[in-house]
């Protein structure tokens, strides 16, 4: 025990004890037993055994080790910039025996290796900085994906196959069904056209890029697990539901409540089994301007969390939507379907189809639609039905005879706007004067703006085309005191020459599908317009511009003031004419 303590440096050794230790070491070689093996001596410490063993090995290789003459005080020295140093550690081998062993070379190589001493004059190599490796390791550990269990060689052999019949068996785990290139680095998901095909009693998932050329071959992925995460009872119920030959839904379906970390392949398999479908992920702005690409993985993980958990499905055939709706569970007026992710098992996601019967609303079977009593409402929430919008307007302004939701002509999906026709002129005037309405549907509650519906191909209401050579009227006055279409001459005569009560009215024009309010008639030059308008009206325009800069004006005022600066400086070379647009109900 005394020799072990001395070897570990825990006891200060005297000179007499050192001489006794050398004698005992020499005597132990003579008293050793066991066929001349010196390591069987009872008074030989473990340190001496390792020293003797390493000494023989080093002498055989010819690589003697000389101990470092540096003291521990060097480790605490302050170095220059970009130089590295180490924190001083306590040396457990501080006795004289160990110092003599270092001088003689009778120590293992690791214990006798000279300490690395950076130069005080030279800059250190940047490759010695281990900070970047630490950050990259943390980023890799935090990435939200798992390695694919199948080998890369088998995957490449599968993708290189020319025919589906020649593809060998290839299994995928439930959470990883696609190759490693499907893992998102920047958090952006890619749109894919998905279709499930059966060939030779084997199921394959066909993936294609909607923006790729016709010559681009789709990707085939074999399926070795059930098609979808839907309960078998729901699948059996789908077959029992009556199928309508008439279209009932739009081919575009909204899926909400998706888990943030749901794999793309899980969405492909779940919804691709109902038919050929385009998976349309919502688009998010790219995050550019990063200082370095070192944090690419970490930034991708953050962006992935910020993506909303919803997706749009565009099926090729309408009957696929009926199958999807029949497979859902109906609860509290909503459709739900189960979907799994690495962190959530069988989560209920909302399936929101759009019924074609919700596009129009008629108060009576035979109702007359008067365009002169029609208003345009933009920013309508997409789930809002025509009957819901009619109910909201009737509570505020009066009876509504017709409501039409603007839809995409191909997909028949809402575009976020509507046209409403009131039953009486009084209700129409009240709606124009009120300008806003609160639309409530399910969990949505939004305040939208009401504007007169401006039509194309309308003659002037004052001259009926006699003073403008029977050209269509380019302006519409949406003020409650006018509500008429005007040609250029009648606009000046009714708003400036007949009196100043209407001089502050602003013309409304139809531009495509939008209705815009202009700050002045476009056929007036800036100087001519400012000369005819009174000073108090010009002051009022300055106040409007001031309020719009503060962000307190309406949507229409912001549009007008945004374009006023360029329009005042530019004199049109020819009379203004509205852009042609089709009109119909």
UniProtKB/Swiss-Prot annotation:
<dbReference type="InterPro" id="IPR012677">
    <property type="entry name" value="Nucleotide-bd_a/b_plait_sf"/>
</dbReference>
<feature type="region of interest" description="Disordered">
    <location>
        <begin position="1"/>
        <end position="32"/>
    </location>
</feature>
<dbReference type="InterPro" id="IPR034819">
    <property type="entry name" value="CPEB"/>
</dbReference>
<dbReference type="GO" id="GO:0000900">
    <property type="term" value="F:mRNA regulatory element binding translation repressor activity"/>
</dbReference>
<keyword id="KW-0217">Developmental protein</keyword>
<dbReference type="GO" id="GO:0005737">
    <property type="term" value="C:cytoplasm"/>
</dbReference>
<keyword id="KW-0744">Spermatogenesis</keyword>
<keyword id="KW-0221">Differentiation</keyword>
<dbReference type="InterPro" id="IPR038446">
    <property type="entry name" value="CEBP_ZZ_sf"/>
</dbReference>
<keyword id="KW-0677">Repeat</keyword>
<feature type="domain" description="RRM 2">
    <location>
        <begin position="373"/>
        <end position="444"/>
    </location>
</feature>
<dbReference type="InterPro" id="IPR035979">
    <property type="entry name" value="RBD_domain_sf"/>
</dbReference>
<dbReference type="GO" id="GO:0003730">
    <property type="term" value="F:mRNA 3'-UTR binding"/>
</dbReference>
<dbReference type="GO" id="GO:0045202">
    <property type="term" value="C:synapse"/>
</dbReference>
<dbReference type="GO" id="GO:0043005">
    <property type="term" value="C:neuron projection"/>
</dbReference>
<keyword id="KW-0694">RNA-binding</keyword>
<feature type="domain" description="RRM 1">
    <location>
        <begin position="251"/>
        <end position="356"/>
    </location>
</feature>
<protein>
    <recommendedName>
        <fullName>Cytoplasmic polyadenylation element-binding protein 1</fullName>
    </recommendedName>
</protein>
<dbReference type="GO" id="GO:0051321">
    <property type="term" value="P:meiotic cell cycle"/>
</dbReference>
<dbReference type="Pfam" id="PF16367">
    <property type="entry name" value="RRM_7"/>
</dbReference>
<dbReference type="GO" id="GO:0007283">
    <property type="term" value="P:spermatogenesis"/>
</dbReference>
<dbReference type="GO" id="GO:2000766">
    <property type="term" value="P:negative regulation of cytoplasmic translation"/>
</dbReference>
<dbReference type="GO" id="GO:0005634">
    <property type="term" value="C:nucleus"/>
</dbReference>
<comment type="function">
    <text>Cytoplasmic polyadenylation element binding protein that binds to and regulates the translation of specific mRNAs. Essential for progression through meiosis. Involved in spermatogenesis.</text>
</comment>
<dbReference type="GO" id="GO:0043022">
    <property type="term" value="F:ribosome binding"/>
</dbReference>
<feature type="region of interest" description="Disordered">
    <location>
        <begin position="513"/>
        <end position="533"/>
    </location>
</feature>
<dbReference type="GO" id="GO:0008135">
    <property type="term" value="F:translation factor activity, RNA binding"/>
</dbReference>
<dbReference type="InterPro" id="IPR032296">
    <property type="entry name" value="CEBP_ZZ"/>
</dbReference>
<dbReference type="Pfam" id="PF16366">
    <property type="entry name" value="CEBP_ZZ"/>
</dbReference>
<dbReference type="InterPro" id="IPR000504">
    <property type="entry name" value="RRM_dom"/>
</dbReference>
<comment type="subunit">
    <text>Interacts with fbf-1.</text>
</comment>
<dbReference type="GO" id="GO:0030154">
    <property type="term" value="P:cell differentiation"/>
</dbReference>
<feature type="compositionally biased region" description="Basic residues">
    <location>
        <begin position="521"/>
        <end position="532"/>
    </location>
</feature>
